[in-house]
């Protein structure tokens, strides 16, 4: 179709599909959930500012993903998982992708600066720089700790959300940063275990390639054990969230640790690695959802009623047990 200035496409729909793959929409959705969680926690309920922040933050994340794909096109060609992506397959040219990334970055900064504040806009741009400069350019091909240090880029979206909502960064925002920072290694290393051969073929020194599955599983468990208490700091001592979030974070954290223990017991099991990777995504999604629900007054009303009902049932069972015990002693 000559009206479309991109090779290897037969229709506009195919062009749009390729550009959608270029920005990695699933990753963006997960990152934006952390932005939303931070804004819910901060108490911002302005729908317009909320929507603009998610749109601007999503554009910044998309720009970073596109630049990353341009830089990594050579190794993507070597990996089975990535060789069909738009750049290594030749469906999109690098210069078109970079132009697209530049437009996204400028639009992101403009939206956030005009409709939220300069701090949020600057943090979004910092996220691009850290992801591209620190992770993609510096660490990804040189250090097995690449995802640990470079993972700071993925922890910036909640800072953007908090800054957009309040115009500043409080301790709660930095706890959110730490939470995502500690969540990233278990999430990414579980995937790296599954794709170990791919990374080895491309010469990328991911931890499972350099150290093997068992040491990687041990590191995953360590980060999971650190993550859970950090997630509870939002309840105490910060008192930003309440009992509903506390229960959700404790349950989700316990399940994450259990999944990590299972992987450590069977570090070569693809099933265990897949289970951990899937649950790590679900963990973050549900945890951020719990942040939003905890800030909703109706949630606390229903939660308190549920706890009161459980206490009533427990008291009734206790009274019944005592009554049966008394009858038994009389008999």
Curated annotation (Swiss-Prot):
From the Swiss-Prot or TrEMBL record, give the protein name: Protoheme IX farnesyltransferase
What would be the name of the gene that encodes this protein? ctaB
Which coarse location class describes where this protein primarily resides?
A: membrane
Note the topology in the membrane.
Multi-pass membrane protein
- Reactions that this protein is recorded to catalyse: heme b + (2E,6E)-farnesyl diphosphate + H2O = Fe(II)-heme o + diphosphate
- Please state the Enzyme Commission number of this protein: 2.5.1.141
Listed GO biological process terms: heme O biosynthetic process
Cellular component per GO? plasma membrane
Alphabetically ordered keywords of this record:
Cell inner membrane, Cell membrane, Heme biosynthesis, Membrane, Transferase, Transmembrane, Transmembrane helix
> Using the chain's own numbering, where are the disulfide bonds?
none
Q: Where in the cell is it found?
A: Cell inner membrane
Q: Which CDD domains match?
A: PT_UbiA_Cox10 (cd13957)
PROSITE patterns from the UniProt entry: UBIA (PS00943)
Family label: Belongs to the UbiA prenyltransferase family. Protoheme IX farnesyltransferase subfamily.
What is known about what this protein does? Converts heme B (protoheme IX) to heme O by substitution of the vinyl group on carbon 2 of heme B porphyrin ring with a hydroxyethyl farnesyl side group.
- What is noted besides the main data? Carbon 2 of the heme B porphyrin ring is defined according to the Fischer nomenclature.
The transmembrane segments are 22-42, 50-70, 100-120, 147-167, 174-194, 220-240, 241-261, 273-293, 307-327
Pathway assignment reads: Porphyrin-containing compound metabolism; heme O biosynthesis; heme O from protoheme: step 1/1
Listed InterPro entries: Protohaem_IX_farnesylTrfase, UbiA_prenyltransferase, UbiA_prenylTrfase_CS, UbiA_sf
Which molecular function terms from Gene Ontology are attached?
A: protoheme IX farnesyltransferase activity
């Amino acid at each position: 179709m000559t009206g479309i200035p991109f090779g290897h496409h037969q229709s506009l729909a195919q062009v749009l599909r390729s550009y959608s793959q270029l920005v990695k929409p699933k990753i963006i959705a997960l990152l934006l959930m952390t932005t939303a969680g931070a804004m819910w926690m901060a108490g911002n309920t302005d729908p317009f500012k909320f929507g603009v922040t998610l749109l601007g933050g999503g554009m910044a994340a998309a720009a970073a993903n596109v630049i990353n794909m341009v830089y990594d096109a050579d190794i993507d060609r070597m990996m089975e998982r990535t060789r069909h992506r738009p750049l290594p397959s030749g469906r999109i040219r690098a210069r078109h992708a970079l132009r697209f990334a530049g437009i996204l970055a400028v639009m992101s900064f403009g939206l956030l600066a005009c409709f939220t504040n300069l701090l949020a806009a600057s943090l979004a741009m910092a996220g691009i720089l850290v992801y591209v400069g620190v992770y993609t350019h510096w660490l990804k091909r040189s250090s097995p700790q690449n995802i640990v240090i470079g993972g700071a880029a993925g922890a910036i979206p909640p800072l953007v959300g908090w800054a957009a909502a309040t115009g500043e960064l409080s301790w709660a925002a930095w706890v959110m940063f730490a939470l995502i920072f500690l969540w990233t290694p278990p999430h990414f290393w579980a995937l790296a275990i599954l794709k170990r051969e791919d990374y080895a073929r491309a010469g990328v020194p991911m931890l499972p390639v350099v150290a093997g599955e068992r040491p990687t599983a041990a590191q995953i468990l360590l980060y999971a054990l650190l993550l859970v208490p950090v997630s509870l700091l939002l309840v105490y001592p910060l008192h930003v969230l309440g009992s509903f979030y506390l229960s959700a974070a404790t349950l989700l954290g316990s399940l994450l640790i259990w999944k990590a223990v299972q992987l450590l017991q069977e570090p070569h099991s693809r099933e265990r690695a897949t289970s951990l990777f899937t649950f790590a995504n679900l963990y973050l999604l549900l945890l951020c959802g719990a942040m939003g629900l905890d800030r909703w007054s109706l949630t606390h009303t229903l939660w308190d009623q549920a706890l009161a009902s459980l206490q009533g049932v427990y008291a009734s069972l206790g009274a019944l047990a005592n009554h049966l015990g008394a009858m038994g002693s009389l008999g």
